[in-house]
Regions:
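TPR-adjacent "capping" and linker segments in tetratricopeptide-repeat scaffold/adaptor proteins
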Residues: 1-9
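Alpha-helical segment of the N-proximal tetratricopeptide repeat
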Residues: 10-29
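Conserved ankyrin/ankyrin-like repeat signature
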Residues: 26, 58-59, 91-92, 120-121
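Ankyrin repeat domain, specifically the short helix-to-loop turn at the C-terminus of the second helix
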Residues: 28-36, 61-69, 94-102
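Ankyrin repeat boundary signal
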Residues: 39-40, 70-73, 103-106
Length: 121
């Protein structure tokens, strides 16, 4: 069964909402049915960026396990690891570092954000 452009747009919007809300199980089902793991919204935010920024470690782990690009920056050149660091999601930062996230990518980079906010990296 194929989706109309309108239906696909709604599924993609729901996918971003699930990443933002930490709906890991539901998002995983969407991925199982063909939603791209590196899907981005109109602002360039990937599913991983939204999950990381909103401190949803379980969702971040699932997306990493499914091959999400840990360095995919949004339209403002922000990386998922810098977003997680900004929000104080230390567990997510460690997870992204463990997955090989580039700490010097983006503006500001995770290193720059850590220095600005006095957080260890």
């Amino acid at each position: 069964m194929s989706l109309s452009p309108e239906q696909q747009s709604r599924v993609f919007a729901l996918s971003h909402d699930l990443a933002r809300q930490g709906g890991t199980t539901e998002l995983e089902e969407f991925l199982d049915h063909g939603v791209p793991v590196d899907l981005v919204d109109e602002d360039g935010n990937s599913l991983l960026m939204l999950a990381a920024y909103h401190s949803h470690a379980e969702t971040v782990a699932m997306l990493i396990a499914r091959g999400a690009d840990v360095d995919l920056r949004n339209g403002r050149d922000q990386s998922p690891v810098a977003g997680a660091l900004f929000k104080g999601a230390d567990d997510v930062v460690e997870m992204l570092k463990g997955a090989g996230a580039d700490l010097d990518a983006g503006t500001p980079s995770a290193r720059q954000a850590a220095a600005m906010f006095g957080r260890p990296l």
